[in-house]
Amino acid sequence: MSVITFVCAGQMNSAITFPAFENGHEVRLVGSPLDRDIIDGLKKDNFHITLKRTLHDGIKYYQIEELEEALEGADLILGGVSSFGLDWFCDEILPVLPEDVPLLTVTKGMVDLDDGTLVPYPHIFEQRQPEGKHINFNAIGGPCTSYELADHDDSHVAFCGKDMETLKFIKSLLTTDYYHISLSTDVVGVECA
């Protein structure tokens, strides 16, 4: 069993708790400052008010002020910030993440810079991490919605990052008979597809 900490309780990050929990891992879901009502509701009855699904009993829920506790002993961290939360995640979360734990982000797509250059989110995260820090950034791409995943519909995604061994490790934690995962070191290709 591994410990997987999910930072941000949005719909997709919360949906990925299904394969993680069903694979026997300890799942910790931390809400962002905007997720306070979501976490309060989950603590009460496991019902996610925006995903409109009941999460597994046994998931541990944390408010953002409890992030440090939720990160203790984690083997994998999932970042569930939307593109609108990019600056907050880079400024507030990246500095406190342990370097020895891989990060898998659900933020899909690319950032359009002022000069028209398109940059995948993993590259933005890497550029924005604190100086001297070396987090292992990975991302999810592909046609999978939070509802499909939470409902156990067959879904196929790609995990991308620089290190294939890390990607294989992450896949081993999350793959199921309904959540199918391909791996690629072509971050740009996966993120722009």
Language model features by range: what are they?
Residues 63-65, 139-141, 183-185:
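Short loop/edge segments at beta-strand edges and connector loops
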Residues 4, 26-27, 135-137, 181:
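Hydrophobic anchor at the start of a short beta-strand
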Residues 8, 31, 105-107, 141, ...:
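Short beta-strand/turn micro-motifs composed of small residues
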Residues 72, 76-153, 171:
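Rossmann-like NAD(P)(H) cofactor-binding subdomain of soluble oxidoreductases
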Residues 1-54, 60-62, 92, 113:
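NAD(P)+-binding Rossmann beta1-loop-alpha1 motif at the extreme N-terminus of oxidoreductases
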